[in-house]
């Protein structure tokens, strides 16, 4: 049996002029790799959920359409995941 460490964390990110709480959860994908499920709430309290996958050298959003304030911060979300992965090991 292979043990996979559960990784979940939340971080505040300034997006669209407001601090927003992004929640991250790592899980396995069907190809044996890993994905991060990410969710955040918009101004109307609608939960926006999406996935990020490691492609080439960075974590990328793998679905759309998403609000521009989410996609504009993809590089920051990538940095937060990389930081957490370094600290979790």
Regions found by a protein language model. Name each.
Residues 6-8, 22, 36, 61-65:
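Generic preference for well-ordered secondary structure
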Residues 11-16, 28, 39-41, 60, ...:
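Residue-level marker of intrinsically disordered, low-complexity segments enriched
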Residues 46-89:
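Acidic, low-complexity intrinsically disordered segments
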């Amino acid at each position: 049996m292979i043990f996979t460490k559960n990784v979940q964390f939340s971080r505040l990110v300034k997006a669209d002029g407001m601090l927003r709480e992004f929640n991250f959860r790592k899980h396995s994908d069907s190809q044996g790799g890993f994905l991060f499920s990410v969710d955040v709430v918009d101004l109307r309290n609608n939960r926006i959920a999406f996935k990020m996958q490691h492609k080439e050298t960075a974590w990328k959003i793998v679905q759309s359409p998403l609000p521009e304030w989410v996609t504009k911060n993809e590089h920051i979300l990538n940095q937060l995941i990389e930081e957490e992965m370094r600290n979790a090991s």
